[in-house]
């Protein structure tokens, strides 16, 4: 069976009010019980872990749009039955007409919309690594969009926090506010008929169903009429790519992560530094302080991920050892200064 980690972790429990669920052929964990149940259903229907991941991801796009909508980006890491590790990069890309010197510096709105990668990434995963047809894998997502689902407290709360932004645009007002113009409350039944139609088209046509044809035209028309620069060519030319896999080792365990835009290299660097600490000897306060210091010093290396020489450096054990000693020396220096000052 394939193993996968996609923006969320696939898995599950016997109780439907949990975010994980368990079946006879595997475990699925996601941010929503309906997504986890969808993954288990696929496993028990003969699908593999990739099929389950894709099913769960599409359900999340329905029931948790604030965190997992199809308008975002995706990265996935996959372990094949032969042990080979592969990655998928479906990152959001900037439109062809984007100019950093003249483009508005907004934090949200139509001018900030790039080329979404989630659909291309999920279809690539399904096509290259899945076993079941895409229309079968997407059945539950379409069902919940068409017939409705009860919104959970977390999603309701996040949409409430974004109400000011939601009210600024006709599309978001239509789909994320009720008939009275209020946010949906926890337990409300939310039906997304238009989104169900979109998902059906994707399930029948794959990538082209979203990045070409009627859906693409509707997206581009809406974006351009409201100040965005996305074009039909931007969508049509988008491709999810194979992602570079980075590998390390932590206390005897192999660690596999992904290259940019994931911070996989920083994750390995953090683990390499942590491997020099005797964590069992630390009390709770020391443990928290140590982790904070390690994360802080590793995050300073984020720009180094872009270049091959510096990438190799931050992945190296020797570099991690130097950083470990610099943290120890800094801690000793602070302790000495405190003692001299009578603290």
For the regions a protein language model found, what residue spans apply to each?
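Bacterial N-terminal signal peptides
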Residues: 1-9
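Noncatalytic scaffold domains of N-terminal-nucleophile
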Residues: 15-37, 41, 47-206, 210-212, ...
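Flexible, polar/acidic helix-loop-strand segments at domain edges
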Residues: 265
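Active-site catalytic pocket residues across diverse enzymes, especially alpha/beta-hydrolases
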Residues: 274
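Phosphate/diphosphate-binding loops
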Residues: 277
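Internal maturation/activation junctions in enzymes
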Residues: 280-343
């Amino acid at each position: 069976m394939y193993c996968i980690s996609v923006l969320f972790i696939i898995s599950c429990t016997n109780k439907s009010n949990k975010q994980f669920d368990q079946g006879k052929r595997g475990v699925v964990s996601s941010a929503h019980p309906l997504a986890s149940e969808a993954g288990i259903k696929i496993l028990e229907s003969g699908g593999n872990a990739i099929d389950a991941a894709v099913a769960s991801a599409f359900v999340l796009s329905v029931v948790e749009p604030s965190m997992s909508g199809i308008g975002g980006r995706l990265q996935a890491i996959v372990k094949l039955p032969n042990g080979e590790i592969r990655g998928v990069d479906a990152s959001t890309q900037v439109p062809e007409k984007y100019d950093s010197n003249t483009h508005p510096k907004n934090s949200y709105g139509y001018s900030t919309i790039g080329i979404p990668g989630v659909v291309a990434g999920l279809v690539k995963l399904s096509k290259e690594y899945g076993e079941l047809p895409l229309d079968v894998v997407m059945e539950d997502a379409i069902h919940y969009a068409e017939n409705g689902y009860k919104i959970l407290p977390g999603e309701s709360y996040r949409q409430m926090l974004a109400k000011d932004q939601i009210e600024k645009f006709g599309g978001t007002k239509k789909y994320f506010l009720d008939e009275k113009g209020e946010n949906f409350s926890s337990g409300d039944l939310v039906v997304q008929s238009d989104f169900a139609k979109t998902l059906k088209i994707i399930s029948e046509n794959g990538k082209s169903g979203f990045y070409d044809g009627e859906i693409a035209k509707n997206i581009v028309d809406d974006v351009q009429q409201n100040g965005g620069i996305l074009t039909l060519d931007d969508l049509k030319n988008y491709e999810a790519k194979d992602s570079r896999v980075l590998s390390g080792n932590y206390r005897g365990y192999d660690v596999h992560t992904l290259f940019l835009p994931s911070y996989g290299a920083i994750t390995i660097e953090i683990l390499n530094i942590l491997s020099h600490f005797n964590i069992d000897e630390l009390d709770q306060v020391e443990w928290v302080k140590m982790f904070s210091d390690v994360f802080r010093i590793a995050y300073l290396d984020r720009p180094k991920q872009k270049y091959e020489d510096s990438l190799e450096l931050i992945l190296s054990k020797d570099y991690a050892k130097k950083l470990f000693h610099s943290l120890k020396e800094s801690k000793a220096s602070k302790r000495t200064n405190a003692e001299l000052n009578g603290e």
